[in-house]
Amino acid sequence: MELNTIGIAGTVAAAPQRHHNIYGQEGVYALWLDITRDSGIVDRILVLFQGNKINSESLGAYPPDAFTPDDLVELIKEGSRLEVTGQLQTYKDWDTGRSQLFVWGAYLAVLPEGSQQLNAVYIKGEILRQPVYRETPKGKHITDLAVLVPSAFTEGYTCIIPCITWGKNAEYTAYLEPGTPIYLEGRLQSREYMKGDQALTTWEVSASKADTKE
């Protein structure tokens, strides 16, 4: 059974902007959603979506047929509280040459001020290559995983979701063979790191549950 679901809720960092058409999808917009962890660290997550996926009633846009999808997008402002459900996907960023992880939004709704934050990921895929087991400078044991999931855009194609497991899950997943089916639960996080003198950001699923028997 295929599974690729993410639900997030946080604060819009800046008003949505037009994005280039992706995998044949037209009328695509992009926004960055900020979600604050209990530790105070902010994860900034890229959301791509189409205007017709917005819940118009959550924006006070009534009757719904009086507003075009573009009208609805313009009602989402910097600082808006937003809920998004959809799938995790990747695309090649030709400006940087890197793969960009993003949420492909299937449903968006504006939330009341002060609403609770959300960051929950559930995926089932298969291990692409040999996992990498490592120890962080703070002494934590982590395993890096590359997990293949189906493309949301092209039947028969896949995309690669970078994931990490930690603690006992890191030990459990460290020696899984490529092709092994795996189920992961966790959250999507952004993480800064240094490459030489350059500060870069990467995105990954931080999995709190890992199972090869689901």
Identify what each model region corresponds to.
Residues M1-E214:
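Single-stranded nucleic acid-binding surfaces, predominantly the OB-fold ssDNA-binding core
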